[in-house]
């Protein structure tokens, strides 16, 4: 078996595709967007990657940003008193190894270019369930790594692992520069305000340099 298709050009699909190319396989990668479209698109998330995940990237020489990305070392949790501005509880933990938060537009666009340079075939297509049979017939193995869009319906919720059947939050994400530093924290800060919501701040790296990722 030497010819493989991967559907989804995200964290899993790109690493798998590049790893398979390095091992001598012929790989076709299906992506809804090109590298340029991803780079110029909207924020995808506020991702924190911890050491085990970062080591997987390093083994594939995909750790392009190790020297420029903030090295986060703590996780701080703060709970406010209900209907008040005073702090009710705060605790902080230290990680054994630094962790990173890199804008996925930067990461995925660079990884797609690396995939192409290694000889991979990038196919720009929004794959639907009806397309899978045709794609599977063209290759010896087809792997789905996408969890978004129609194709996610292939994977029903595992009710033994979750009691929820819909999102529990309405999310807003933005990146800001030149935010005032906080002396007590060198990493993500999770703030809970009862009755209002949650607010996460993570030092990270975006297209224009270091930033604070707010969720």
Give each language-model segment a name.
Residues 26-27, 63, 121, 141:
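Residue-level detector of anion-binding/catalytic polar loops
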Residues 20, 43-44, 156-160:
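Short, glycine/charged-enriched secondary-structure capping and boundary segments
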Residues 37-82:
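N-terminal FAD cofactor-binding segment of flavoenzymes
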Residues 110-215:
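Predominantly flavin-linked oxidoreductase catalytic cores and closely associated redox partners
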Residues 5-9, 18-42:
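Glycine-rich FAD pyrophosphate-binding loop
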Residues 94-115:
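Well-ordered mid-protein domain cores that form the structural environment of catalytic cofactors
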Residues 13-14:
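N-terminal Rossmann-fold NAD(P) dinucleotide-binding loop
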Residues 71-73, 78-95, 183-191:
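Charged, glycine/proline-rich intrinsically disordered loops and linkers
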